[in-house]
UniProtKB/Swiss-Prot annotation:
Residues 1-56, 207-285, 309-379 are annotated as: Disordered. GO terms for biological process: signal transduction. The sterile alpha-motif (SAM), but not the Ras-association domain, is important for its interaction with MCK1 and responses to cell wall and oxidative stresses. PANTHER family: LD13733P (PTHR24135:SF28), SH3 AND MULTIPLE ANKYRIN REPEAT DOMAINS PROTEIN (PTHR24135). Mitogen-activated protein kinase adapter protein; part of the MST11-MST7-PMK1 MAP kinase (MAPK) cascade that is essential for appressorium formation, penetration and invasive growth. Binds to the MAPKKK MST11 and the MAPKK MST7 to maintain the stability of the MST11-MST7 complex for the phosphorylation of the MAPK PMK1. Is also involved in the MPS1 and OSM1 MAPK pathways, and especially plays a role in the activation of MPS1 in response to cell wall stress. Its function differs in the 3 MAPK pathways. The lineage of its organism: Eukaryota, Fungi, Dikarya, Ascomycota, Pezizomycotina. Disulfide bonds: none annotated. The keyword Zinc does not apply. Interacts with MST7 and MST11. Interacts with MCK1, MKK2 and HIK1. Keywords: Virulence. It comes from Pyricularia oryzae (strain 70-15 / ATCC MYA-4617 / FGSC 8958) (Rice blast fungus). It comes from the Eukaryota. This is Mitogen-activated protein kinase adapter protein MST50. Residues 37-54, 256-265, 328-346 have a biased composition (Polar residues).
Length: 489
């Protein structure tokens, strides 16, 4: 890299001319002016920094970065800018590239360069090389005063770069226009080629058939009919229970739940283990059943339309070996319609004063639709959420709470709490925890439910009863005058 011949440095020329003036008006010290070569030395044939009449082999700058120059390369650089008389001083002071980029006026003055113009020439030349090589300029480096305004004016190089960028832009736009014209022509040809094929496809399509006065749906009228009666339903029709289309005949006649097809349930389409009490219609059935028993005073006959004629054993009913010894017969009392809402047994022993003297009748269980019991781990909480009992409460605390919930004003020791799951049932002991047991069975998918049963004993001695007996041990053969109802809860 070399500088063009004839480059003028206005600062140095002005300083040289200014030094020739009177010393009194000059801001430069007299010692500097006396030591200046332009005043003290006789005229010589050597060139000045503005003439560059002498060109040596040092014209060419080193190809390395200025910060990596050696002392000899720095001396060659000083000779290149026309100040060859100071080259030996740079070699003597071992000024390398790192020191050259950080030189200031004071440093050059200490090296014996007393001319302000020569110092400005050296510093400005070093700054130009740093800018050309993209060497970072530190805050303590020399920066010319005119360098602050250099970026505000466009140079010939900037204009050349701008013209080149505009030329490249025009070439790209021309290429884009050619590509767009070619795509438009290809699309036009494709459209012309596809139009005949589209016309043929359109002509080949057949129109959809039209409906003539709904004749297409006439065949469905003959296919919709009630299902044929099955052998199981035909065999039971003589006994009072029959299956109809979308209805089910139950005990209470016409109720909102009776004619709903969603509550259709027979012995052959659902097992008896899933039959539980519907809480939404239990109260209504209990009131009507108790009124019916109180008025007639008789056991419902097998042909009564309000009760089924079949006597199907239930998983909640006691075995035949127990008979009537341990479990009392259920009844609905007309003076207590509310407690009877949870019972599913009916017998005339207590509905009529003379019923016990006539003949004992086995208790009959009414068919009730299965309620929507809550599933999951919170099923026990849903059932006993209003009982005010906790999961750890034993049976002798849960049993009084259940009786109080259903307004059964009877001693709690006259009742036993049974848990029914699947086709099995078990009497809970007084120390067992019903809710924990319910939760365990529900997790196993056995669909448990609780049931209250009245015992024959008047009082139960908790201290003498064995766990799991629920008062049945002392209730053998005992009689009581109070007979509240029991049932499924």
């Amino acid at each position: 890299m070399s500088f063009n011949t004839g480059t003028a440095y206005a600062e140095s020329d002005a300083d040289d001319e200014y030094e020739r003036d009177i010393h009194d008006s000059s801001p430069i010290d007299a010692t500097d002016a006396e030591a200046s070569p332009t005043e003290s030395d006789p005229p010589s044939n050597e060139h000045t920094p503005t003439t560059y009449g002498y060109r040596s082999s040092a014209d060419r700058l080193p190809e390395t970065i200025i910060s990596e120059w050696t002392a000899d390369e720095c001396a060659d650089f000083i000779a290149t800018i026309g100040l060859e008389q100071y080259s030996t001083r740079f070699v003597e002071n071992e000024i390398v590239g790192e020191a050259l980029v950080a030189l200031l006026h004071d440093d050059l003055k200490s090296m014996g360069i007393h001319s302000v113009g020569h110092r400005l020439t050296i510093l400005r030349s070093v700054y130009d090389v740093k800018k050309a090589q993209d060497v970072p300029v530190e805050s303590d480096h020399y920066v010319p005063l005119t360098a602050e305004n250099e970026g505000q004016y466009a140079t010939a190089k900037d204009i050349k770069n701008l013209v080149e960028q505009l030329r490249l832009r025009d070439e790209r736009m021309h290429l884009f226009e050619q590509d767009f014209r070619r795509l438009a022509e290809d699309f036009r040809r494709l459209r012309e080629d596809m139009l005949p094929a589209l016309r043929l496809a359109k002509d080949a399509q057949q129109p959809l058939p039209h409906l003539n006065n709904g004749s297409a749906y006439a065949g469905y009228d003959t296919t919709i009919s009630p299902p044929a009666p099955t052998p199981s339903t035909s065999g039971q029709s003589g006994g009072g229970l029959k299956r109809q289309w979308s209805t089910k005949k139950i005990m209470l006649g016409t109720t909102p739940k009776a004619t709903s097809p969603t509550h259709l349930q027979t012995a052959h389409d659902r097992s008896l283990a899933e039959q539980t009490l519907d809480p939404s219609s239990a109260a209504e059935r209990a009131v009507m059943s108790s009124s019916h028993l109180a008025i007639n005073g008789l056991v419902p006959s097998a042909t009564s339309p309000s009760y089924p004629s079949i006597n199907i054993p239930s998983p909640t009913s006691p075995p035949n070996t127990l008979g009537g010894a341990t479990l009392a017969s259920r009844s609905y009392r007309s003076d207590q319609p509310t407690p009877s809402s949870r019972s599913t047994f009916a017998e005339s022993d207590y509905a009529h004063p003379g019923g016990r003297d006539k003949q004992p009748v086995a208790p009959r269980r009414m068919q009730t639709p299965a309620p929507d019991t809550p599933s999951g781990s919170n099923a026990s909480v849903e059932i006993f959420k209003s009982f005010r009992v906790s999961m750890d409460d034993p049976c002798y605390k849960v049993l009084p709470a259940a009786l109080k919930k259903y307004q059964i004003n009877a001693p709690w020791d006259q009742y036993a709490l049974y848990i029914v799951y699947g086709d099995q049932e078990r009497c809970l002991g007084l120390e067992e925890k019903p809710l924990i047991l319910f939760k365990q069975l529900d997790k196993e998918g056995k669909k448990p439910m609780f049931m209250l049963r009245k015992t024959n004993n008047a009082q139960v001695d908790i201290g003498n009863e064995a766990p799991g007996s629920a008062g049945l041990g002392s209730a053998r053969g005992a009689a009581t005058g109070y007979d509240p109802p029991g049932g499924i809860i």
